[in-house]
């Protein structure tokens, strides 16, 4: 099955309150479009952590092997997948060349999920004209704002 996954993460402060929003879309054999939204947040987190959580939650929801087109405005995630960073971190025992890999447990989980699917990652400009990225941003912002007073 072909699936499109859009995801965005947000934090106010880094660290600070944050949220993520994710949309999964697929077209069934009859041509019907199906969408599912996911969102969540944490009181004290970082933007990168929320970006990762959004992608992970979307992939966790897939119950069978899928061809996934991932769209994210996080260059960190897209570059990690497309430029071999994830592979290199794994090879080094989940460390960066210069030391600690932040959110290593999330990168490990993402790596396991990626092994179950054929994922192609694409960068999209945030806060621009991509309808689904903007919807994910709104979901992430709403979750983040639950933790701000």
Feature map (PLM): residue ranges:
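RNase H catalytic domain
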Residues: 10-17, 55-135, 139, 144
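RNase H-like nuclease fold core
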Residues: 1-49, 53, 57-66, 138-149
């Amino acid at each position: 099955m072909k699936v499109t996954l859009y995801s965005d993460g947000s934090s106010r402060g880094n660290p600070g309150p944050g949220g993520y929003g994710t949309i999964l879309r697929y077209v069934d054999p009859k041509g019907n479009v199906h969408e599912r939204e996911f969102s969540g947040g944490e009181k004290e987190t970082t933007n990168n952590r929320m970006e990762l959580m959004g992608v992970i939650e979307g992939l966790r929801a897939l119950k069978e092997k899928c061809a996934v087109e991932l769209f994210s405005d996080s260059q960190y995630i897209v570059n990690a997948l497309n430029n071999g960073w994830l592979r290199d971190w794994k090879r080094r025992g989940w460390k960066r060349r210069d030391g600690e890999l932040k959110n290593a447990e999330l990168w490990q989980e993402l790596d396991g999920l990626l092994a179950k699917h054929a994922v192609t990652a694409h960068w999209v400009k945030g806060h621009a004209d991509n309808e689904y990225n903007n919807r994910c941003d709104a979901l992430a912002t709403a979750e983040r704002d639950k933790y701000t007073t």
